[in-house]
Amino acid sequence: MLETDHSRNDNLDDKSTVCYSEKTDSNVEKSTTSGLRRIDAVNKVLSDYSSFTAFGVTFSSLKTALLVALFLQGYCTGLGGQISQSIQTYAANSFGKHSQVGSINTVKSIVASVVAVPYARISDRFGRIECWIFALVLYTIGEIISAATPTFSGLFAGIVIQQFGYSGFRLLATALTGDLSGLRDRTFAMNIFLIPVIINTWVSGNIVSSVAGNVAPYKWRWGYGIFCIIVPISTLILVLPYVYAQYISWRSGKLPPLKLKEKGQTLRQTLWKFADDINLIGVILFTAFLVLVLLPLTIAGGATSKWREGHIIAMIVVGGCLGFIFLIWELKFAKNPFIPRVYLGDPTIYVALLMEFVWRLGLQIELEYLVTVLMVAFGESTLSAQRIAQLYNFLQSCTNIVVGIMLHFYPHPKVFVVAGSLLGVIGMGLLYKYRVVYDGISGLIGAEIVVGIAGGMIRFPMWTLVHASTTHNEMATVTGLLMSVYQIGDAVGASIAGAIWTQRLAKELIQRLGSSLGMAIYKSPLNYLKKYPIGSEVRVQMIESYSKIQRLLIIVSISFAAFNAVLCFFLRGFTVNKKQSLSAEEREKEKLKIKQQSWLRRVIGY
């Protein structure tokens, strides 16, 4: 299934289209780094080494081994990520810093937002696996610091360093599968690294309960420590088939040398060119913008008084100014902007970026306090609430597998994106209906299943459309942009949900239960669940309060889901083929064919 047509290498120099002039094509060739040329050479070996047939589909043996290793790596790093996310609460609590968990999550989101594009650019220059090893070093150092630190500041630093490595794994896995797969199989291939979510969703909770808790307060250190061993071993399994393919390519004389600098360049010139290649100034401006805008949202936490404090206002104002400077830099001065200028006129990329942001934002608003709502308003246990809250990730991954297989035989990704976007609105509507215990937990579970299926139909098929709109040279960079926007949507959604929750819930509880009890329940709702079981008068008032706030959250989520459904109609409905990427001529032919279709076919994408 994961068969790539290597004729794309000849198509990169195509100069026959109107839109992509001879100058543009020469720029593409010029910008093809030694890392990308090495990637192409290794991919050819991976595809041509040997093959076998199963289920009527031809598979490359070495490529299949690499993808199986990628699956194992995804299982180990995914499990480590889920466990780290859970035990950081226990770790912070052991240092008496439980209230700082929100700040940790915000900084992690910012890190994940800003490192994706630099990782993509560096991997284009030096190679995917070479960059993967660099990410592994950061990940392992972060895990070691987190496991051994005697202070909370050390824990914070370790978690942030670990996030630098983990975010690299996510980007590089997607870029690697993009290198190895044709567009028709891209949706399925991109999900290989995330398929283990299907398993980890159900086992991570049991592992967390065994390495964290009150019985052994510092046992959480093992939750970090064991992955200092597991992840490097799984990485070795991933590296071996790729390095073997590199060796075969080198032995045949087809592996280009890795150029760290051009002939005649000084060290200073080399470093300056490297800074230009990864758009270092843009990265710094983008990072500062996110920190100064998103961090105040977390610090203020929706409390009106804090929004009026000088340092909050100053951070937001300065952040907004830096955001404006960042836009000017990207449009006027950056030699290698985040969005390559050759694609500035392509609506598919902008619509996809906006959809990625809007869908994740609306989804995070719904998910942010779902565990608390399940325990307070539905009477679910901690383990049950955690598993229900993970249904989205589970169903999204399952749906990605099915959609990925279907796209191999029906190569029209936009159809699935449109269907998923409309289904997402229906799912959010069901969540609005089934939001308290009186409506039944089965209804809420059903609604979460619908939303999860919708997410699986939207994300990777939409990414496939974006990949069809770009060349291989820019594929990793555009993927990094999509990942960055995803994380920004996640952070903004959490901030909006926190603002609504903080400003409205306390007032509701105080109005219904009085100042003393209302504030006590607001601060620690889980401490009162056994004292006031479902059916008691106090619990009834708690359920009514939480139901009212959940209603507001779902209304906001529905609004964003509806906006996402409108946006999906503006994507270009490319028909994808077995090539790694479309040539400029093929893209222009596809655009012309789409223009000649009826308006209904253009909107739906079939």
From Swiss-Prot:
Which InterPro entries does the record associate with it? MFS, MFS_dom, MFS_trans_sf
Membrane topology (Cytoplasmic):
1-140, 209-224, 301-310, 359-360, 411-414, 457-480, 572-606
Q: Which GO molecular function terms does the record list? A: ferric-enterobactin transmembrane transporter activity; siderophore-iron transmembrane transporter activity
Task: Tell me which UniProt keywords the record has, alphabetically.
Answer: Endosome, Ion transport, Iron, Iron transport, Membrane, Transmembrane, Transmembrane helix, Transport
Q: Which GO terms describe its biological process?
A: ferric-enterobactin import into cell; intracellular iron ion homeostasis; transmembrane transport
CDD domains associated with the record: MFS_ARN_like
Briefly, what is this protein's role? Involved in the transport of siderophore enterobactin and so has a role in iron homeostasis.
The residue range of the signal peptide is none
- Family according to the record: Belongs to the major facilitator superfamily.
Q: Where in the cell is it found?
A: Endosome membrane
Q: What is this protein called?
A: Siderophore iron transporter ENB1
Membrane-spanning residues: 141-161, 188-208, 225-245, 280-300, 311-331, 338-358, 361-381, 391-410, 415-432, 436-456, 481-501, 551-571
Q: Which GO terms describe its cellular component?
A: cell periphery; cellular bud membrane; endosome; endosome membrane; fungal-type vacuole; plasma membrane; vacuolar membrane
Q: What is the lineage of its organism?
A: Eukaryota, Fungi, Dikarya, Ascomycota, Saccharomycotina
Matching Gene3D superfamilies: MFS general substrate transporter like domains
Question: How does this protein sit in the membrane?
Answer: Multi-pass membrane protein
Ranges in the Lumenal compartment? 162-187, 246-279, 332-337, 382-390, 433-435, 502-550
